[in-house]
Amino acid sequence: MSDLTHNDIQPYQAHPELVRALGRVAVFMGGDSAEREVSLKSGKAVLAALQSAGIDAVGRDIQGCLLRTVDEPDFDRVFIALHGRGGEDGTLQAILGQAGIPYTGSEVLASALAMDKLRTKYVFEGCGLPTPAFRAMTSVGEAEGIVAALGTPLSVKPAHEGSSIGIRKVNSAAELAEAYEAAARLDDLVLVEQWIEGPEFTVSLLQDKALPAIGLSTDHAFYDYDAKYLADDTRYRIPCGLAPDDELRLQHLALDAFRVLGCRTWGRVDIMQDRAGEFWLLEVNTVPGMTDHSLVPMAAKAAGISFEELVVRILRDTLAEGIDA
């Protein structure tokens, strides 16, 4: 595991004028999705960092009806640390937007697109960006035909879950049918795509710039939920191990993916490299994890940006254009 920590960079304090301009900030965390526990960890880390930087910030554990979050708000803007359905799929963004409350991250359409892995791939494909061949699967009876069309191994995933929840690797039509049934219990829409054999990379994006890429390796079959948040044997490579030209190509691809979906301010793009050296887009995360295992803070640190500065820079983009603070 990487020995990067948030504490190796000098303490960061937001400028007093910026603190005044931001007003009171509510960090929304928790939620009712399958990623609730991860979101609570992210939200608590973000809240502590904002407070450490001098921002007037409070935490809000969001559960139940999202419409209630804007009833008589006692805050000026929201830092969204909700992962998964409700908080990352455009729903909360629409509610806050209608209420006139500024919020961090991507707007409604980009959030909804990025949360839908199948439609994200349609956009990538339509824009000529490389993404593994795929099919939408709606019944067990399609397993034989999908294997005939795509070959094996394959990745099976619920189309609207994050944090690698529900993802399986399969090597036959029988395994695909079983994996489909498991994924369908989590989501009405199931995505099947060709499995790319090779190293995995992730590129974090901040204010339309790519941070240093991170190479990922794990003793698990792939970078799954346990490897992301629980395991101590996950290895992070910073520098990522690619030649400089290849890392630049990787970063440009990540920026292209972020832009074609219309995302803003910050996010993370997951990419595979095959044995021939070609890169393949997997997905875009518009509210990535911000825990002690999370990748965006690691990439920021490699760029000389402390965790406190990172969250303040994300938050600063909620200010109206023309405000110089």
Curated annotation (Swiss-Prot):
Domain ATP-grasp: 121-316
Gene Ontology cellular component annotations, sorted alphabetically: cytosol
A molecular-function term among this protein's GO annotations: D-alanine-D-alanine ligase activity
Classification via InterPro entries: ATP-grasp (IPR011761), ATP_grasp_subdomain_1 (IPR013815), D-Ala_lig_Van_CS (IPR000291), D_ala_D_ala (IPR005905), Dala_Dala_lig_C (IPR011095), Dala_Dala_lig_N (IPR011127), PreATP-grasp_dom_sf (IPR016185)
Residues holding Mg(2+) 2: E283, N285
Pathway: Cell wall biogenesis; peptidoglycan biosynthesis
Xref: SUPFAM superfamilies: Glutathione synthetase ATP-binding domain-like, PreATP-grasp domain
Cofactor note: Binds 2 magnesium or manganese ions per subunit.
Compartments reported by the entry: Cytoplasm
Binding site for Mg(2+) 1: D270, E283
Positions of ATP binding: 147-202
Keywords: ATP-binding, Cell shape, Cell wall biogenesis/degradation, Cytoplasm, Ligase, Magnesium, Manganese, Metal-binding, Nucleotide-binding, Peptidoglycan synthesis
EC number: 6.3.2.4
Xref: PROSITE patterns: ATP_GRASP, DALA_DALA_LIGASE_1
Reactions catalysed: 2 D-alanine + ATP = D-alanyl-D-alanine + ADP + phosphate + H(+)
Cofactor(s) this protein requires: Mg(2+); Mn(2+)
GO biological process per UniProt: cell wall organization; peptidoglycan biosynthetic process; regulation of cell shape
Family: Belongs to the D-alanine--D-alanine ligase family.
Function: Cell wall formation.
Record protein name field: D-alanine--D-alanine ligase
Organism: Marinobacter nauticus (strain ATCC 700491 / DSM 11845 / VT8) (Marinobacter aquaeolei)
